[in-house]
């Protein structure tokens, strides 16, 4: 499929080929296009994509696309600019001025605590699709972005490089939420995300230790062993198990047992957390295939 030949008819054919609903694939097409347009601007130098899965067929099969979530990070050691409405408006105006594939874009901006939300509507072939971009300030300033390749699902020859929020920092944030909120966790998605990262990624345990220590200090959460013990006890906690099962059904994802999910998270977290509680240093690389540190 050449870049200048994408039509509504061809998108419908791809919908049948990929076994993805037309509405979902249309949303994926516009979100991917929006991402490429962002990467063509100078604003992209300060934006680190936080989503772990956003531009692949499995993501497009889901009922709704998650917002593109960026962290407003450093630009190669340059002085950090303030993340404010002026910056956000300039960003939104530039990406929405583009008319690639004859898509028309409109936007509005909203502030939500420290974050900015850019609500964008893309109109293509007389069809309108709402999309959302969330931009958050960088909290842990020692974090460094990772380079990732974005390969278009729709155009074989189209690709670009973008900055990805570092996996260890992202994972540490998930673990901090688990330990901070315990049974009051707002969404079980945090457990899902953490479990899948530990299943797929080799992780630098020292980085997790440093980031988790920073987050605890930043929000005045004292590392105590009773927190990890309480978390481990949730394997027989009916309330948490039912919440997990409800989440799995709603998301339509692989039905991994609650006990399996919690076991892997505790296995990873306990050595790091215990070292923090004892004010000891921690070294070790997590090996997902072995489910242990080396």
Q: What do these predicted ranges mean?
A:
Residues 1-47, 55-68, 72-294:
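Structured mid-to-C-terminal alpha-helical surface segments
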């Amino acid at each position: 499929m050449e870049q200048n030949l994408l039509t509504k008819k061809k998108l419908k054919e791809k919908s049948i080929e990929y076994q993805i609903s037309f509405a979902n694939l249309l949303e994926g097409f516009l979100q991917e296009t929006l991402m490429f347009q962002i990467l063509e601007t100078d604003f992209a130098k300060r934006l680190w994509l936080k989503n772990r899965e956003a531009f692949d067929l499995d993501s497009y099969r889901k009922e709704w696309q998650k917002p593109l979530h960026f962290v407003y990070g450093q630009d190669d050691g340059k002085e950090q600019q303030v993340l404010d409405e002026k910056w956000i408006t300039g960003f939104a105006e530039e990406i929405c001025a583009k008319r690639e594939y004859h898509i028309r874009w409109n936007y509005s901006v909203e502030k939500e605590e420290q974050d900015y939300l850019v609500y964008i509507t893309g109109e293509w072939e007389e069809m309108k699709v709402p999309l959302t971009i969330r931009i958050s300030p960088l909290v842990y300033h020692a974090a460094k972005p990772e380079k990732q390749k974005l390969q278009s699902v729709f155009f074989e020859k189209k690709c670009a490089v973008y900055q990805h929020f570092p996996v260890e920092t992202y994972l540490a944030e998930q673990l901090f939420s688990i330990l901070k909120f315990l049974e009051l966790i707002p969404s079980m998605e945090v457990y899902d995300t953490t479990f899948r990262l530990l299943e797929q990624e080799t992780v630098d345990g020292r980085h997790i230790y440093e980031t988790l220590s920073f987050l605890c200090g930043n929000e005045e959460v004292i590392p105590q062993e009773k927190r990890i013990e309480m978390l481990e006890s949730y394997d027989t906690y009916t309330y948490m198990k039912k919440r997990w099962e409800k989440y799995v059904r709603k998301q339509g994802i692989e039905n991994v047992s609650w006990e399996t999910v919690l076991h892997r998270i505790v296995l990873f977290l306990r050595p790091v957390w215990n070292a923090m509680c004892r004010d000891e240093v921690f070294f070790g690389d997590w090996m997902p295939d072995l489910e242990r540190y080396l």
